């Protein structure tokens, strides 16, 4: 028979007492009062923070947006079909954040930074808050480096700098997304990280953009954040902030980033839906009163950082759709007032075959020539002036039949300059190619050609300079100045190519 040893028992009891961990776990909980339309009303959750994540019994996550005296209004990040009245909810003590890392490059993710491209999990050791404050005044420096889009009309006349916010605005089907994707393609080899945020788009449109980027090798330096039109309003509202958090991760690591929001007016509609369901008072066009703040806090995160912070940058290109050219609607005017300029795309120009359909007259960049290299400044000034004079003359010439020779020549020159601004989609030009194209047009070398021949001649001239006069591109890229030597090389090339072209024709 086993003997009971009192000292052993007392030792065991003593050990257990010493190991006893008096950890008290306080959980902030509540009860679901009602649920529906992506909104839940919760009783309890007394100490919840505004914007805090809450977790429902069946696993759905929500964000506490309305903190009222009797209940808490929560927006759901999912369909919430399994949430029942009376089920419990607990506060997590966390604000919405996402994992961030280099591994996101080349991937398609949703607003919660979960991959949706079927290529497995993305591993990351760091995270960032989805909503983080924009850099302050001391943390910034003025924009001075160009961000080349590869489109002559933009780089010459409406230049965009690294750290700028430039709005792309126009009616549907005028090529807004094409301008943005061409800009992404043109960043190849420029060490710029691109983030494309698709908000409330058709899934087929997003797939088209992703395929176009993959075919041309641009996905290597691009992240696509997509929330399609059938996504919950909460996720459409969060998607742009997720994209901004990813771009900021690279910006604070001394990298240059480009972020495209396509389009913030869909985000505003999702936010309006959430606000109305939460019974917040509606304002103009039924948008809530803080819809301006919705976009300003997003776009202010784009910046050119000071040298103390490493001079990283985040350039934002929001895309806003207008209804039959009306830029005085609520969301367009809001975004115009926040951004540093706008590129206006016109349906009339698009239908007239001028593509990209940029209306140079009413488009503007508030950074201006600070975002251009010296070589571009040398040739672009004349182009702007001549096109402005041509637009004026063309309007006047409609009412007059007999024009003097000088006016006819000016009109002919203007038509050829307009022709040289046309570009095919997904064929961005280098700075050197743009400079030689503009120089050829503004110095009258195209005047002897028929309008239909202009684009063909310019294509052949660019190929000729690339193969026969490679020194031209070397001079422009190394000195950033359109030197006399470069000018002499270009004049020779134009003359030689002109002779070859006339023989072929």
Swiss-Prot record:
Keywords: ATP synthesis, ATP-binding, CF(1), Chloroplast, Hydrogen ion transport, Ion transport, Membrane, Nucleotide-binding, Plastid, Thylakoid, Translocase, Transport. It catalyses: ATP + H2O + 4 H(+)(in) = ADP + phosphate + 5 H(+)(out). It comes from the Eukaryota. ATP binds at residues 170-177. GO terms for molecular function: ADP binding; ATP binding; proton-transporting ATP synthase activity, rotational mechanism. InterPro entries: ATP_synth_asu-like_sf (IPR023366), ATP_synth_asu_C (IPR000793), ATP_synth_asu_C_sf (IPR038376), ATP_synth_F1_a_nt-bd_dom (IPR033732), ATP_synth_F1_asu (IPR005294), ATPase_a/bsu_AS (IPR020003), ATPase_F1/V1/A1_a/bsu_N (IPR004100), ATPase_F1/V1/A1_a/bsu_N_sf (IPR036121). One of its GO terms (cellular component) is proton-transporting ATP synthase complex. It is a peripheral membrane protein. F-type ATPases have 2 components, CF(1) - the catalytic core - and CF(0) - the membrane proton channel. CF(1) has five subunits: alpha(3), beta(3), gamma(1), delta(1), epsilon(1). CF(0) has four main subunits: a, b, b' and c. Produces ATP from ADP in the presence of a proton gradient across the membrane. The alpha chain is a regulatory subunit. NCBIfam families: atpA, PRK13343.1. This is ATP synthase subunit alpha, chloroplastic. It comes from Oenothera biennis. The lineage of its organism: Eukaryota, Viridiplantae, Streptophyta, Embryophyta, Tracheophyta. The gene is atpA.
């Amino acid at each position: 028979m086993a003997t009971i040893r009192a000292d052993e028992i007392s030792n065991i009891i003593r050990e257990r007492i010493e190991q006893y961990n008096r950890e008290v776990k306080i959980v902030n909980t509540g009860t679901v009062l009602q649920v529906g339309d992506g909104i839940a009303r919760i009783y309890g959750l007394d100490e919840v923070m505004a914007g805090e994540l809450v977790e429902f019994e069946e696993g759905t996550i929500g964000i506490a947006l309305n903190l009222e005296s009797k209940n808490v209004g929560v927006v759901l990040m999912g369909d919430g079909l399994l949430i029942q009245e009376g089920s419990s909810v607990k506060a997590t003590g966390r604000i919405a954040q996402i994992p961030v890392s280099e591994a996101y490059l080349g991937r398609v993710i949703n607003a919660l930074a979960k991959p949706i491209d079927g290529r497995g999990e993305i591993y990351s050791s760091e995270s960032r808050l989805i909503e983080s404050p924009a850099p302050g005044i001391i943390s910034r420096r003025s924009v001075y480096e160009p961000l080349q889009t590869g489109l002559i009309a933009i780089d010459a006349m409406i230049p965009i700098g690294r750290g700028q916010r430039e709005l792309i605005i126009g009616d549907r089907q005028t090529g807004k997304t094409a301008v943005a994707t061409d800009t992404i393609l043109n960043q190849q080899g420029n060490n710029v990280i691109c983030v494309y945020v698709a908000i409330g788009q058709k899934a087929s449109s997003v797939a088209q953009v992703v395929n176009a980027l993959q075919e041309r090798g641009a996905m290597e330096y691009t992240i696509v954040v997509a929330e399609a039109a059938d996504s919950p309003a909460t996720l459409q509202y969060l998607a742009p902030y997720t994209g901004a958090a990813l771009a900021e991760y690279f910006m604070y690591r001394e990298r240059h980033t480009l972020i495209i929001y396509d389009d913030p007016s869909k985000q505003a509609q999702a936010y309006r839906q959430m606000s109305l369901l939460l019974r917040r008072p509606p304002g103009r066009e039924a948008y809530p009163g803080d819809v301006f703040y919705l976009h300003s806090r997003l776009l202010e995160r784009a910046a050119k950082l000071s040298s103390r912070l490493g001079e990283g940058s985040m350039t934002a290109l929001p895309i806003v759709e207008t209804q039959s050219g009306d830029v005085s609607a609520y969301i367009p005017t809001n975004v115009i007032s926040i951004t540093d300029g706008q590129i206006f795309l016109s349906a009339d120009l698009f239908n007239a075959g001028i593509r990209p359909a940029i209306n140079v007259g009413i488009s503007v960049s508030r950074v201006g020539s600070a975002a251009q290299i010296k070589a571009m400044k040398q040739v672009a000034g004349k182009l702007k002036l001549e096109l402005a004079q041509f637009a004026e003359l063309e309007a006047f010439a409609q009412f007059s039949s007999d024009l003097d020779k000088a006016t006819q020549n000016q009109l002919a020159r203007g038509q050829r300059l307009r022709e040289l601004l046309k570009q095919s989609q997904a064929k961005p030009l280098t700075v050197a190619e743009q400079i030689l194209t503009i120089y050829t047009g503004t110095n009258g070398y195209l005047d002897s050609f028929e309008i239909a021949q202009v684009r063909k001649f310019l294509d052949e001239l660019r190929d000729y300079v690339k193969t026969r006069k490679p020194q031209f591109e070397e001079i422009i890229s190394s000195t950033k100045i359109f030197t006399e030597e470069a000018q002499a090389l270009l004049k020779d090339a134009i003359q030689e190519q002109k002779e070859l072209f006339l023989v072929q024709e």
